[in-house]
Regions:
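A beta-strand signature from Gram-negative outer-membrane beta-barrel systems
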Residues: 123-125, 134-177, 189, 826
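Surface-exposed extracellular loop regions of Gram-negative outer-membrane beta-barrel proteins
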Residues: 248-263, 417, 493-500, 512, ...
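C-terminal beta-signal and adjacent terminal beta-strands/loops
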Residues: 542, 715-727, 753-829
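Membrane-embedded beta-barrel scaffold of Gram-negative outer-membrane proteins
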Residues: 290, 296-302, 306-314, 527, ...
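Face-selective signature of the C-terminal outer-membrane beta-barrel domain
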Residues: 239, 279-311, 315-317, 321-499, ...
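Transmembrane beta-barrel wall of Gram-negative outer-membrane proteins
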Residues: 182-212, 217-254, 273-296, 486-488
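Gram-negative outer-membrane beta-barrel transporters
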Residues: 391-396, 478-479, 590-603, 618-725, ...
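Periplasmic plug
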Residues: 89, 94-148
């Protein structure tokens, strides 16, 4: 079906002009409270909301302190419009945060379309542009601004938006507090904060957090340790500060689960473990100085070091079409000679051997085919990153041709060093779906059926440098008209050196890449009355290809998986062009509303496409994708009640044709069901993991001076699974299981707070109040387990020498009903 286009920005401009003419005679009323919002990564003076041509959203520290918000993604998911979460990793500190269909994720290989800044330091990491949410301490955040669109001032990866965070200091948050919580699944946490200043201008702030839980899914504990400190000095014109952040976290997120196994046991896991350890250290020296009433200087210099290791137990999909049950005579002899006993002498099959392992062990002893006979795999990675840089900007406030004008210009330099290592060790699956490793590695010592070495090793060193300059100017054409022009030029160099296959050429990851681009933006805002503000904007943003994408972009050397790097040819930058228009205003004294439309088109988007060799592919630039939609919001206060609603419609579609691997998709072009094949994406097909409809509501009731209650609701429509990019998958109950979608859902949360006095308060929180079983994401894939959880290889007879497999829909389950209670004591009040 042909998609109907959204109105052009010119229509909104005409609408703004019409409102300006109609209401020109009305007297201009000043807002009682003017909220100033920073419009650059570095702290500056900022602009009033009514001067910003976009649906910017903000939150304060008191919002983060709400007991319902475990971390920053929780707050954004519950309260900010157009934000939703995919829990692909299934750990509360490792979500994919999506805004208007663009993502900030901690998972390598995810296209990162949102930039995140903390006190002017870009948190997107050098390797993969990922964002590790567990490294951001909730209790250190003073404010959050979600800037919409491809705002070029915020630099690379600002395709759909930018998240700008500012931390607390001793002036903004003096005093001390300690808080403790305990709840479901052995969740317990303790956090503290201390802030203050003296009459000499010295100020200080420190906070720490210790969080542990067993997790609601099997074998999914987490241990989070965060500390943040800031020391500074301030006088009437100058503010200097040095901040330090340290984190040491161990996270277990056991990921997606096959739909039948999830229906049998909602807490079950497909394979385990899936552990991530993050250790991080960062320093940031920041300052600003007011030269005079018209000129403000600001800047920072930072250093950050992160070490990430992963240990993942997975199924070896290359064993699914193999004979893995009955050891041969030679294998039985090898087992006996090695001292093993108890192995079957004949007749072993899927019915009587639910978890086979003897052929795996025997093939390791014989150095024969363990890569095919071992049904388990242990994947290990280590990433070491160092990045550092400095930036500076100036803001000038004056007049241009007699009109008020605010100009900000700046520049920055960012550099990084990265080393990434990956290995894979074979093993076998146990009854609890853990993996027992054996002494055989995917290190190139064995060939596959096509004669290619089985080698999953990666050892890559990389360096990058980015120079940038930017400027933004807001000109008040009249008292109610504000025109903003912005632009940023980025020049990035990425140098990769393969430690296993140096020197370039086929299969080498060596590469030297340069990317540069100027991204412009223009916005117009008009405020004809206190009750109405109209805006329209156009902006552009870009991102450079990641090392993961560059490392698997060679058609002559396709990869089995996106992270099985094999070559390093050039890719183009992804460029996003965003149009946005809307209205916002107030009704009475305590009601605010907004309505807007947006369209973002990605050019040269990067997609993992299929190769002629079954199951293989490579990254390439893919025509166009489009994300467009409508946003509506309403917030109000009525006596002791505060309430609000947000609705978003997102139409996210592919706009070009491409062939991609669709082995688990029922509509693929394979000669027989259950075999490997490709699917064709066509313009208009909906993009996976992006729901069409989002609705959020919340209500807070201040019962009296001591008691308060809060109720929240999130409703999300269904979305297509990864692997179902053509939207054509249909279950047949035999070869293909599940709908290829995740269903829509609505969940509620309820919180209560009791303030005993100015210092002491108690709180309780219940999330997923009605214990709804739901999923936030889905993916198609071959399954190695039957409905009862037993391993099954060769589930069907061979067709033309190939063995069909069972493919299913894998789901990312949401947390069941969970509750916790807590106490907070604030000193000095």
């Amino acid at each position: 079906m042909k998609r109907q286009n959204l109105p052009r920005t010119t229509l909104a401009l005409a609408l703004a002009a019409a409102f300006g003419q109609t209401l020109a005679a009305a007297p201009l009323l000043e807002m009682e409270t003017v909220e100033v919002i920073g419009t650059t990564p570095l702290p500056g003076v900022g602009l009033a909301r009514e001067q910003i041509a976009g649906n910017v959203q903000t939150a304060k520290s008191r919002d983060l302190e709400d007991a319902a918000n475990l971390n920053l993604p929780d707050l954004m998911n519950r309260r900010l419009g157009s934000v939703f979460i995919n829990e692909v990793q299934n750990n509360p500190f490792q979500p994919d945060v999506n805004y208007r269909g663009f993502t900030a994720s901690p998972l390598l290989g995810t296209p990162e379309g949102l930039s995140v800044y903390l006190d002017g330091v870009r948190l997107n990491q050098p390797f993969g542009d990922v964002v590790s949410w567990d490294l951001i301490p909730r209790s250190a955040i003073a404010s959050l601004s979600l800037m919409p669109g491809s705002n070029p001032v915020f630099g690379l990866n600002t395709l759909g938006g930018a998240i700008a965070l500012q931390t607390k200091d001793g002036y903004s948050h003096p005093g001390a507090a300690i808080q403790a919580t305990y709840g479901s699944y052995q969740r317990r946490s303790v956090e503290f904060e201390i802030g203050g200043h003296n009459d000499k201008g010295l100020h200080w702030f420190t906070t720490g957090n210790l969080f542990r839980e067993n997790g609601w899914r099997d074998d999914s504990p987490s241990d989070v340790r965060q500390w943040f400190g800031k020391l500074g000095w301030m006088d009437a014109r100058t503010d200097l500060s040095l901040s330090l952040a340290v984190a040491g976290n161990k996270l277990t997120g056991n990921g997606l689960q096959e739909q039948r196994l999830l229906a049998n046991d909602y807490s079950s896991v497909y394979t385990k473990p899936d552990e991530t350890r993050n250790n991080a250290f960062s320093l940031n020296l920041a300052g600003k100085h007011s030269v005079n009433d018209d000129l403000l200087l600001s800047g920072n210099a930072y250093y950050r070091k992160i070490r990430t290791t992963t240990y993942n137990g997975d199924i070896n999909e290359d064993a699914l079409d193999q004979s893995v049950y009955q050891p041969s005579a030679a294998e039985r002899t090898a087992l006996a000679n090695a001292g093993y006993s108890g192995f079957p002498t004949s007749g072993a099959n899927a019915a009587n051997t639910p978890y086979p392992y003897w052929r795996c062990i025997a093939n390791v002893l014989l150095n024969d085919e363990p890569a095919e006979k071992c049904n388990g795999l242990i994947n290990r990675t280590e990433t070491r990153q160092e990045n550092y840089g400095l930036s500076g900007q100036f803001s000038y406030f004056g007049k241009l041709a007699g009109m008020k004008n605010q100009f900000t210009g700046g520049g920055g330099y960012d550099a990084s060093r990265v080393r990434f290592r990956q290995s894979a060790q074979f093993g076998y699956i146990n009854p609890d779906h853990s993996i027992t490793p054996v002494n055989f590695y995917a290190d190139g010592s064995e060939l596959d059926d096509n004669g290619n070495p089985i080698d999953s090793r990666v050892d890559l060193r990389g360096r990058s440098q980015t120079w940038s300059i930017y400027a933004t100017d807001t000109l008040s054409l009249a008292e109610i008209w504000h025109l903003t022009l912005s632009g940023r030029y980025n020049e990035t160099r990425i140098v990769n050196r393969d430690q296993l296959t140096p020197g370039g050429g086929s299969g080498s990851l060596d590469g030297d890449h340069r990317f540069s681009r100027f991204n412009p933006a223009i916005g117009l805002s008009v405020t004809p009355s206190r009750a109405l503000n109209v805006y329209a904007a156009y902006n552009e943003g870009s991102r450079t290809p990641t090392t993961i994408e560059l490392g698997c972009a060679d058609p002559a050397n396709p990869c089995k998986l996106p992270n099985a790097m094999a070559g390093d040819p050039p890719l183009k930058q992804v460029v996003t062009k965003t149009w946005e228009a809307g209205l916002r205003g107030v009704l009475g004294a305590k009601t605010q509303w907004n309505a807007g439309v947006f369209r973002a088109e990605n050019q040269d988007d990067i997609l993992f496409v299929a190769d002629n060799q079954a199951g293989y592919g490579y990254f390439k630039n893919f025509g166009k994708t489009r994300r467009q939609g409508v946003e509506l919001g309403l917030d109000s206060s009525l006596g002791a009640f505060d309430w609000g609603v947000n609705y978003t419609y997102i139409d996210a579609t592919f706009q070009s044709e491409e062939t991609v691997n669709g082995a688990a998709n029922s509509s693929n072009d394979a000669s027989s069901k259950g075999l490997d094949g490709n699917i064709v994406i066509r313009p208009g097909d909906r993009m996976p993991l992006i729901p069409k409809h989002l609705f959020k509501a919340h209500a807070d009731w201040r019962i009296n001076g001591a008691w308060s209650l809060g109720l929240g609701m999130q409703a999300v429509s269904g979305s297509f699974a990864r692997g179902n990019e053509n939207n054509q998958h249909q279950a047949d109950g035999t070869y293909y299981l599940g709908s290829g979608k995740s269903a829509g859902y609505a969940i509620f949360d309820l919180g209560a707070k009791y303030r005993a006095n100015r210092q002491l308060s108690f709180f309780a929180q219940i999330n997923n109040l009605f214990d709804r079983q739901y999923s936030t994401a889905a993916q198609l894939g071959a399954t190695g387990f039957g409905a009862g959880g037993n391993f099954v290889a060769r589930p069907f007879a061979a067709v033309g020498g190939n063995y069909p497999l069972i493919s299913s829909t894998f789901l990312a389950p949401g947390a069941p009903r969970t509750g916790w209670v807590g106490v907070r004591y604030e000193f000095g009040k």
